[in-house]
Amino acid sequence: MKLMILDGNSIVNRAFYGVRPLSAPDGTPTNAVYGFLAILQRMLDEQKPEAVCVSFDLKAPTFRHKACNFYKAQRKPMPEELAVQMPLLKETLDAMGIRRYEIESFEADDILGTAAAVCERSGWDCVVVTGDKDSLQLVSETTSVCNVKTVRGQTETILYTPESFRAEYGFAPAQMVDLKALMGDSSDNIPGVPGIGEKTALDLVRRYGTVDKIYSSLAALDIKDGVRKKLTEGEASARQSYWLATIVRDVPLLPRGEHLEQQLYSGALRRNEAARVQTLH
């Protein structure tokens, strides 16, 4: 069985900025909805999953925001032209019978990670569809990540498997967290180690593996004294950044006593012919 889960906020943002302005007869913008559904249909055609669902962020602060007030603090509010399309998109997904997950205190990425973990322990394949690289840490033998972008209305995709990821980055997918812990992530306002950029961070992860291994033998590493000094002074920031960048994989998606595996499996057996997808309930 194959589950496909879409990173709702990420995909709709890519669609909004990648598709020319469109509107309904009453003037309501629709380009983001159109672009999202086009990506959804393409992924359904290419991946042919037995089940599909979508994760969304909520407006309320998550546990990361509450712990670190600088987390994503630089983000601008969602453009009004996009905000007015969100209810329409969710109504459309509901009409198609596609299950939506929005969990208080957690991000959409954490829902993606939890779905991937469910698939792994259930022996299913999982395809995560996203416009961000945060989810690349989830790539495994059972989980692939399809990175999507829309350019001038045309959708481009890159499918990451353990082999293709390692060929591009030179280390294991799980070490994406270590990379972000060192170099930071300006889009999420994750600081990383001050003075350590992408090139140096990539070299460190490729040579020494993980943040823990780097700091456990920092004095003996074959690195420049300046880099060692930055790492020494920035250890607390690296540890905090590692925590912020790590996707949670045990989000409580269902009330206590209910089993997500059963929900996904039973939903996958119910075919919505009008939408041409198999749904989650």
Residue ranges and their predicted role:
Residues 1-53, 57, 64:
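Non-catalytic, usually N-terminal nucleic-acid engagement modules in DNA/RNA processing proteins
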Residues 10-11, 59-62, 133-135, 152:
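Conserved nucleotide-binding/hydrolysis micro-motifs of P-loop NTPases
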Residues 23, 73-255:
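Extended two-metal-dependent nuclease catalytic cores across DNA- and RNA-processing enzymes
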Residues 6-11, 17, 45-48, 54, ...:
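Metal-dependent nucleotidyl/phosphoryl-transfer cores and adjacent nucleic-acid-binding surfaces
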Residues 31, 81, 260-262:
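Residues that cap or flank secondary-structure elements
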